[in-house]
UniProtKB/Swiss-Prot annotation:
Family, similarity comment: Belongs to the UvrB family.
Sequence motif Beta-hairpin, location on chain: 94-117
Keywords: ATP-binding, Cytoplasm, DNA damage, DNA excision, DNA repair, Excision nuclease, Nucleotide-binding, SOS response
The protein's assembly and partners: Forms a heterotetramer with UvrA during the search for lesions. Interacts with UvrC in an incision complex.
Organism: Protochlamydia amoebophila (strain UWE25)
UVR domain mapped to chain residues: 633-668
Role: The UvrABC repair system catalyzes the recognition and processing of DNA lesions. A damage recognition complex composed of 2 UvrA and 2 UvrB subunits scans DNA for abnormalities. Upon binding of the UvrA(2)B(2) complex to a putative damaged site, the DNA wraps around one UvrB monomer. DNA wrap is dependent on ATP binding by UvrB and probably causes local melting of the DNA helix, facilitating insertion of UvrB beta-hairpin between the DNA strands. Then UvrB probes one DNA strand for the presence of a lesion.
Gene that this polypeptide is encoded by: uvrB
Residue stretches making up the Helicase C-terminal domain: 433-595
Protein name per UniProt: UvrABC system protein B
Predominant localisation class: cytoplasm
Length: 673
């Protein structure tokens, strides 16, 4: 590790097997400005470790693109551990629930947009863009959310607030600037994206921070002192000479731009009126007139309106059809893109634009939106491609397009440093598959193993989970209806042994790193289709490749082409690994991977609480006899702070104790209040 380098890789391991050769090939091609490369790495060969080494050698800001939030969360954890002193960030959709605006002409049903935003992920998204604007040592792990419209990087950077000690500036001007950046004044509840004023002291809680706020102390119009403080207690952490505060939203716009945008929105409305009058569509004319005029009034009075993103083209002064700014525009021109599980991620990138366009077409046709709403959209594939400087496609089963882009050259990584072989695959009849699978589950669980069970539908995964639970088998299901944070928590609980069987569909395929899994059972393996294709079967089998006892059972009444090809590839790779093991005297061993916390829900900061120590219970029990209401509230803040600190340092039992103590004080608070 070279301390003069920006990206510093921290690991106790050295590249081995065919990792060194893969790293050298990838780095050499990147330095030679080759645009596209393919890394074909089997499950368990250390593709993530290889890419971490590549980043450390090329020293470039990197975007790692994953095809779902679960895989993105896992990659974020891993890169955070590899680069603890660099800005490793997480950028995925911040919606826990999202119902887009839509209209169904057949039933004349208008569906208003409804959503629930995850505050933690919103903070992480803002932290990601702030890091890109302030630092060069940035690694961002993202889902396809990165190709959706985001606020202009020029406006976001240009509207920041820079304060320095000794600077002369009126306090009211600072407050007005904060409001323009969409911060709210709140002198009672100090939370993210708010500020409070107490005499000559101004406290600001940046939108991208979690446990750090800024205190600005003034004397008249002079900034006398700037400090970093604890937002819970107000305790000063350290004095600083200057600070730059970034907006609390990516969709900020300077006032002069907003006024110009309102003019162009009115002009577009006039054009649309004429169109509907010519077509004699008076109902649609009334709709668009009423909706747009109301939005313009809101923009004039409060600076924003519901569905403001549909006017994004006007606010960014783009031409019709021009692509919106997105996360890719925040990166410097020489950034490196890594597309993980590219055979899955690229089709997603292709599909995003068409799905969005079809829904909005109806809204525009029937007068619910102006045509400019079309330009609030994800990027087309060719627009994404045009923003790529250099890319590495990473997959165990790369698609033909990626290979063609790389000029037919593939960097292979087929050896597992752990010596683990591809799992033995057994074919069993599909008739009676559930009962047979149950017996196998009991056998593996009794030995401390975990089981992945894949089905073809969400409904079947839920019904099968209920059936297993009724038979005293601890099981949970995982599919796309489960929100981001909960998915991560479910996988962590499986690894910890809170339950033993995870039932799912395609979320149990690419990238999930669960070394405790000793059995993968594939129901209805002979049902040819997307979920039982050659690629899908190889990827699903790979989930058992991190355990020395790993096995796969396919339940099928016939051997399909996909099953046959999977068996051939697996046998070939087993033979290659066995030769390597014999040559180097390696005994296969199960991967050991630390179980860490990525994000905790607000409700349950710690997954596995222990019993609270008796003295803590006693202290909380007796507290109401001598504590005032203000003292109880201070105790709650102290407990919350200690709980978060313990959880962040992975002292889970202690964190659970603090959480339980906090809840006791909250009950006492209710009684006293």
């Amino acid at each position: 590790m070279n301390p003069s380098q920006l990206f510093q890789l921290h690991t106790e391991f050295e590249p081995c097997g065919d990792q060194p050769e893969a790293i050298n090939q990838l780095v050499a091609s990147i330095l030679q400005n080759k645009r596209s490369q393919v890394l074909l790495g089997i499950t368990g060969s250390g593709k993530t470790f290889t890419m971490a080494n590549v980043i450390a050698k090329v020293q470039r800001p990197t975007l790692i693109l994953a095809h779902n939030k679960t895989l993105a969360a896992q990659l974020y954890q891993e890169f955070k551990a590899f680069f603890p002193h660099n800005a490793v960030e997480y950028f995925v959709s911040y919606y826990d629930y999202y119902q887009p605006e839509a209209y169904v002409p057949r039933t004349d049903t208008y569906i208003e947009k409804d959503m629930s935003i995850n505050d933690k992920i919103d903070k992480m998204r803002l932290s990601a863009t702030r890091s890109l604007l302030e630092r060069s040592d940035v690694i961002i792990v993202s889902s396809v959310s990165c190709i959706y419209g985001l606020g202009s990087p020029e406006y976001y950077r240009g509207m920041n607030l820079t304060l320095s000690q000794g600077q002369m500036r009126r306090r009211d001007d600072i407050l007005l600037h904060l409001v323009e950046m969409q911060y709210k004044r709140n002198d009672f509840e100090f939370i993210r994206s708010t500020f409070r004023v107490r005499g000559d002291v101004l406290d600001i809680f940046p939108a991208y921070e979690e446990d750090l706020a800024i205190r600005v102390e003034m004397f008249g119009d002079e900034i006398e002192q700037i400090s970093e403080i604890d937002p819970l207690t107000g305790k000063v952490k350290r004095r600083i000479a200057s600070i730059t505060i970034y907006p609390s939203s990516h969709h900020v716009t300077p006032e002069e731009i907003r006024l110009k945008a309102m003019e162009t929105i009115r002009a577009e409305l006039d054009e649309r009126r004429q169109f509907y009058e010519t077509e004699k569509k008076y109902l649609e004319l009334e709709r668009i007139q009423q909706r747009t005029m109301y939005d313009l009034e809101m923009l004039k009075e409060v600076g924003t309106c519901k569905g403001i993103e549909n006017y994004s083209r006007h606010f960014s002064m783009r031409q019709p059809g021009a692509p919106p700014p997105c996360l890719l525009d925040y990166f410097p021109s020489d950034y490196l893109l890594v597309i993980d599980e590219s055979h899955q991620t690229l089709p997603q990138v292709h599909a995003m634009f068409n799905g969005d366009r079809a829904r909005k077409q109806t809204l525009v046709d029937f007068g619910f939106r102006l045509p400019s709403a079309f330009d609030n959209r994800p990027l087309r594939f060719e627009e994404v491609y045009g923003r790529i400087h250099q890319v590495v496609y990473v997959s165990a089963t790369p698609g033909a397009w990626e290979v063609q882009e790389a000029g037919g050259e593939i960097v292979e990584q087929l050896i597992r440093p752990t010596g683990l072989l591809d799992p033995i695959i057994e074919i069993r009849p599909a008739s009676g598959q559930v009962d047979d699978c149950l017996a196998e589950i009991r056998s593996h669980v009794s030995k401390g193993g975990r089981v992945l069970l894949t089905t073809l539908t969400k409904k079947l995964s839920e019904e099968l989970t209920t059936y297993l639970n009724d038979l005293n088998v601890k099981a949970k299901y995982l599919h796309s209806d489960i929100d981001t944070i909960e998915r991560v928590q479910i996988i962590r609980d499986l690894r910890l042994g809170v339950f033993d069987v995870l039932v799912g569909i395609n979320l149990l395929r690419e990238g999930l790193d669960i070394p405790e899994v000793s059995l993968v059972a594939i129901l209805d393996a002979d049902k040819e289709g997307f979920l039982r294709s050659e690629t899908s079967l190889i990827q699903t089998c790979g989930r058992a490749a991190r355990n020395a006892e790993g096995r796969v059972i396919m339940y099928a009444d016939k051997i399909t082409k996909s099953i046959k090809r999977t068996l051939e590839i697996t046998e070939s790779r087993r033979a290659l690994q066995m030769r390597y093991n014999e040559q180097h005297g390696i005994t296969p061993r199960t991967v050991k991977r630390e179980i860490s916390v990525l994000m905790e829900s607000e409700e349950d900061q710690v997954t596995h609480p222990t019993k609270l120590e008796e003295e803590i219970f006693k202290a909380a029990e007796e507290a109401h006899h001598y504590l005032t209401l203000d003292e109880v509230r201070l105790k709650i803040k102290e407990c919350e702070k200690e709980m978060k600190k313990a959880a962040k340092e992975f002292r889970f039992e202690e964190a659970a104790d603090w959480r339980d103590q906090m809840r006791r004080y909250q009950q006492i608070e209710l009684t006293l209040a």
